[in-house]
Amino acid sequence: MARQDLGFPLSMRQAHRYQPMVPSSSSILSPAVRSLPREASLSGVTPSSGGLSISRQGSLAAGGDDVVQFFSTTFYVKETEKARAVVRVVRIGTLQGPCSVEWRTEDSSAQKGKKYKEAKGTIDFGPGESVRSVEVEILDDDSFDSTLDFLVLLENASNCVIDPEGRQCVVMIMDDDIFPSNAFEEELEQQSEDLLYEVGWSLLRAFMWFCYEHVPEIAKKSVAMLLMSMLGNAYYLGTIFIRVYLVDTVLNNTDPSTESRLWFPGDRDSTAVALGLAWILPNFILLGSDWFEMKKLEMGFNIRYHLRVNLFRKYLNYTDKSVSAVPLQDLKISMMEDIPELVSQGYLIIFELWAMMGKIICIAYFMLRKHPFSAIPLFVYPLLIMLYLHFTYTQRLQLMAKEGEGQSATTGTVMQLHKAQGLIQAYGASGYVVHHFEKILRNQRSLTMQLKTFEFWNSQLIPWITLLAIGIYMSLASRVVLHGHTSLGSFLATINVYKDLGDRFSTVLRGFTSLSKSISPLCGLTLQFSLEVDVPARADCFKRREAFALSWIQVQRGRKISMDDIPIVFQDVCVDYSPCMNSATGGLTAHAPQGSIIQIAGPHDSGKGIVLSLLCDALPPSSGSVLVSPHLHLLNVPHVPLFMGSVGVFGNIHVISDAGEYSPAMYARGLRMLQRLRLDKPWIKEMYDSEARALREAAERMGHGSPESKFWCYEEDDDGNNEDEEEEEEEYNPWINRLSTSEKWRLQLARAFLHNPHVLALTRPVQELDEDLRQVILSCFQEFVTARGLDMDHLDVAHRRPRTVIFTTGATDQYDIADYVWRVSPSSGVTVEKRPPRRV
């Protein structure tokens, strides 16, 4: 087994031969500064002398030059009852004398009062203390959320300096609740859509309750909608009686008794005018109600926005297995079709059904009051609808699932064509691809027609029942009217009511059919929301790293060292399929000191990239541990350049498109980086300047009170429905094709330098460059390490954390800048060579 000796004391090497355990807080940490309720202010908390302490003399000046930052940029906590997020803050420097820093929480995707309790306070470091902690109380609920987070910020330092890159951390709340309800945990264990179909109506009820209870503003808007729908029903009932009154009283001049029943006794003309006004004027109230509903109570956007954001956030945290289970075309269909369909047919439809049921109640009241015998269809319609839905439920969902699969296949083929168009043309496969696409389209057409045929016969049920009911009632006209069982006005009104009743029950059937249709996208979304995410694995990794760093500090207490001296440790690491780190070659055990340059040299396919993947948590080891202090930010830069096609040079190297993030310093540093890496061609600079100018102008507009919405991509037009609009094609960006292979790589490297990670891991960064460019890149690596960052002017070098570069090369390549060379060989595993001190 290859091991590395970097000159550390024996006690330190031995300390890393075992998996570090977290020491008890009572043994190494002073009592935590806890986020108590506001009435118990934290500002007066005084740490005890038993705090965790390490010292470092000579690297920083005493007193106010000590640096304070968060122990990690990300902390994790489970959303369980009485959970508290523990957030650690570290002090780096001489540790001489006291210092303090204020802290506070701030909303991000998680909101105070809903997911956590707002807290703030002051952290006091005593002489020799290097690690302190605060706690934030997490609020547990039974409602599903994808992983939400909030911020904790440091500010107002006293006798110390806050590292700008470590002044803010994210606390991720791991929600273990299930969408849309925890009641379906058993069905989701098998990840079967068929099992969800069996409980589809229960799932739909849970979704409705989820929207009502959990989506912001929906509860009060829903109640308002239900109440306002009753206005229309009241008007509808009034119009029925107006028509009966008009025929039986106002127009019945043969019956003298009607004179006394006129609104204006003895004046039929005035009464008729009053009836006309009674028919017209309430519509102004209904118009105002409709306007208020459209302007203030539009709920579709709120629910769609909530579901889309949660699914988007969930997808970003998917494991590789989960990503493979949800192809990109399925995600697109879920976002742009399934969610709008679910919201429209699975929640908003209930208000239409509520209004229709109200009208049916009005009709029932009229029928039972005027002619009870005519109310028989009131009982026939619901019975037939329930039986029909019961017997067609499964068939409908099966047809919808097949039609959805056909649509997914068509969309997926088009998306694959977009990616592989050049390859298809180069190898003359266009004919085969077109034939295959035609076959997919024919299959989709067949599936669509099956569903349409089914829906056609669905739509015939209520109209035919209504036709029969009216015909039978008309055949009884002579007996009903002439024998005095009802008046002519009531009889004619009942004929109209029968037609209205059929229309209402047709709407009810369509509504319940829509509800049953919504179960299909709901089941699909439920499965996507339940897929595994990598946040728990990242949380476990963070705990191991935190335990390692705290254990290392405990072992090294009093040795005049700081967190800058915590190495990166590969401890008996084996990967079964790795050519160089399997059980036969003995795995890898090595220490990588911060502030060093490490070259991983070896032939092709020897496993060099696996080392970088292990380092950056992209790959779990089969055995052993990779231990890294959590305060280190690691960035793995792949050999294949990655770009965002929707933005240009500026957006790609700074990874921003929001004007609020733009600053002149950002522009200047990016420009210097492009010049250093020989990326200063006129057209590149012109594009860079053009993007920067647009962002600067947008920022100026924001400063003048015209802020651009951060959620512009989700905004809709005035009618609240942009789902049916044709999607705009993304504008093609040919600038990427103008870059050479070398320029693409250097642009990616510029992005990495600008984001200034503590550990920069690169795959073959100089492999395909000429000698001149190779030296440019290597000199940048060297300055990045020695100056603790490249082209950074906002913080003195003494206040920056060390930078480390680990890069892979061919087996025979040798570079003087490397402090250590890890030689990778399938036959001998990994051997470590210490190089002579690098030339600065």
Language model features with spans:
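Cytosolic ends of transmembrane helices, especially the final helix of ABC transmembrane type-1 domains
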Residues: 402, 406, 410, 422-429, ...
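ABC ATPase nucleotide-binding domain signature region
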Residues: 593, 597, 601-668, 672, ...
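Transmembrane helices of ABC transporter permease
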Residues: 230, 351-400, 475-486
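Juxtamembrane loop-to-helix connectors within ABC transporter transmembrane domains
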Residues: 316-360, 419-422
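Membrane-integrated ABC transporters
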Residues: 21, 26, 30, 43-46, ...
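Short boundary segments that mark the start of a structured unit
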Residues: 1-208
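Helix-loop-helix
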Residues: 256-260, 366-380, 450-523, 624
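ABC ATPase nucleotide-binding domain helical subdomain, centered on the C-loop/LSGGQ "ABC signature"
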Residues: 309, 650-734, 778-782, 786-787
